Structures are given as C-alpha cells and as structure tokens.
C-alpha cells in the first residue's frame, strides 16, 4: 500500500511538467527564454526578504494587493515567502487594447479590504508606460493608508511615459513581448514557470 501511495503522489507533478513546454522545446511563436524558473524564484525570495526587513511587525498585517490577472502568480509566490503577517487581496484594472496600452485605465474589480491606517503593497506584473501603476498608487493614497509601496516583477524602461519609482523591482528587461509566469498573450502561456520572449504577432 505504501508503494502505491508514493507512486501516485510522485506521478502528479511529472504529469504537470509534461503539460508545460520545456525551455528547449518552445512553441514556434516563442523566441527564447528570457528569465528561467530558478532565476525568477531566487529573485522573488530576495524581494520577500527586503519587504520583511522594511515593514515593522508591530504595525499590523501588511496588505498585499495583487493586480489581476498578470500578477497573480507573482503575488502568490511573493506572499508565500513573506515571514511577517500579511493579508492578500486583488484588484483588476483594464488599460490594454489589442496588446497595447491605451493610457485609459479603468477599474474592473476593487479590493474588499479597508486600507485606512494600513501599510499597502501593490504587486504588479510589468511596468510599461506607467499608467496603470500610477492610477493605482494615486487611488490607494486617497484611501488614507499608512503607506503605499510597489513591487513589480518586470520593468521596461524604454516604454516609460510617466516617471515612477518602484520600491521592489524584480528585473529590468528590453522592450520585447513577454509571456509566462502570469503574463499572457490572448490568455495563453500564463502558466509557464519561466518568462519567454514572444515573436511579435503579425501586423504588430
């Protein structure tokens, strides 16, 4: 019975791995792996340690707000590594049309947590033009928190329109299309454990 239990447990992760393309067997529309799984996880661990050091435990649970959908994996991994007390919530906004940022940010789903008198950490997948992050930071500051800081997985400096300061940054990357680790193209590739450069779609 013990052998059967171990065999069943071990086979589940193997099956999941087969459903995810390996870095050396990428789909034709993915050009290369930009950031590998191990590199991403190391950086997330480092960011969590920085956050733990910056927020005093005596000031209550940290409110971690992940921006859907792209930051949901980053938010989960980051939150799991935090040692200080925290609460996780999510918010959804829309600023992209046809894969390009429009500059018109709309709130699609708000958080349920009250931010007044609390430290808030906004977790975003990518800093592109800066419109979305600027909108969120300004909106959250109007809710009278103790502080609002930002954690961003990827930064594209070449795409900046607004000058924004990121408190906790994962990686700076070139101006290329990227998918994986929560980021998608047409709802595909979100669950890749790495981040890959995508060949630009035809006409883009």
Regions found by a protein language model. Give the residues of each.
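PRPP-associated nucleotide enzymes
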Residues: 1-204
